[in-house]
Amino acid sequence: MNQEYLDFELPIAELEAKIEALRAASDDKVDLTDEIKRLQKKSNELTKKTFANLDAWQVSRMARHPNRPYTLDYIEHIFTEFEELAGDRAFADDKAIVGGLARLDGRPVMVIGHQKGRSVKEKVQRNFGMPAPEGYRKALRLMEMAERFKLPIITFIDTPGAYPGIGAEERGQAEAIARNLREMAQLTVPVICTVIGEGGSGGALAIGVGDKVNMLQYSTYSVISPEGCASILWKSAEKASTAAEVMGLTASRLKELNLIDSIMQEPLGGAHRNYAKIAENLKLRLKEDLAELDELSKEELLNRRYERLMSYGYC
């Protein structure tokens, strides 16, 4: 996969291009090792400096980075024996939601998540990660299956929002989301949710009601996109950077408000720089969360989840 850079990363991109050019030019007659090491050190220092002070708008753009790992990437790196399950048994199979049975270090679990595409064809097939009602009904079907077989549920959240098309509304988009919220609140098995990219409004919440809610360092969680907020408040999407700052959509701000449990640190430069490392960190977090939740009885699990939901909105 070709590495892509955002505009605030362009100085880093220039250094990386120079490093690649030197590597290509290096041969037995010309040893450029020292110069390459010097530039690599300079690139690392510049990357640390750049990412030490990202604002909310820059974090929003990182959450949408085209190279960022998606749900299926995490499934590949974290789980074994993944068996995808399809369809809502009522209308269709929504490719914007993926899910199925898998093993986490040998333990059977149910994994569900939003899935975006990378190529134009994949993006269209996955509807840009925006599920229709049948996607949320598929997710609910898998959750109910997990409860019947007493399997923990692990969800990965990464969507700009639920699909707002006419067909989706006619098929009951709002009802599908609302039903998921109600049913997830009553599940008697552990539910762990992780925001890996964009956490867009009800489209994210529909698989986001859990006993543990974690976020990656450069992910976002909000009721609307910065562009949408800016269009409503200032009648211009160009105010998106201002909107991002006041919306409090970053992981650090949401942790301050006690809306999430933990923040997963990403590799230097973002999760897309090192899939294996971020997957390793996330796997450890999932195992720790499961171990904690396993100690609770069904009643304690439900009571804690209820108290968690009722605490939202209180300072």
Swiss-Prot record:
Any Pfam family from its record, for instance, is ACCA
Q: Name one GO cellular component term.
A: acetyl-CoA carboxylase complex
- Please indicate if the UniProt record lists Transferase as a keyword: yes
Q: What is its EC number?
A: 2.1.3.15
An example GO biological process term is: fatty acid biosynthetic process
Domain CoA carboxyltransferase C-terminal, by residue range, is 38-292
Location(s), subcellular? Cytoplasm
The reaction(s) catalysed by this protein are: N(6)-carboxybiotinyl-L-lysyl-[protein] + acetyl-CoA = N(6)-biotinyl-L-lysyl-[protein] + malonyl-CoA
* Chief location: cytoplasm
Q: Which UniProt keywords apply?
A: ATP-binding, Cytoplasm, Fatty acid biosynthesis, Fatty acid metabolism, Lipid biosynthesis, Lipid metabolism, Nucleotide-binding, Transferase
Task: Indicate the enzyme's highest-level EC class.
Answer: transferase
What does the record give as its pathway? Lipid metabolism; malonyl-CoA biosynthesis; malonyl-CoA from acetyl-CoA: step 1/1
Judging by the UniProt lineage, the source's domain of life is Bacteria
Instruction: Kindly state the subunit structure of this protein.
Output: Acetyl-CoA carboxylase is a heterohexamer composed of biotin carboxyl carrier protein (AccB), biotin carboxylase (AccC) and two subunits each of ACCase subunit alpha (AccA) and ACCase subunit beta (AccD).
Biological function: Component of the acetyl coenzyme A carboxylase (ACC) complex. First, biotin carboxylase catalyzes the carboxylation of biotin on its carrier protein (BCCP) and then the CO(2) group is transferred by the carboxyltransferase to acetyl-CoA to form malonyl-CoA.
Record's NCBIfam families?
accA, AccA_sub, PRK05724.1
Q: Which family does it belong to?
A: Belongs to the AccA family.
Q: What is this protein called?
A: Acetyl-coenzyme A carboxylase carboxyl transferase subunit alpha
The gene name on file is accA
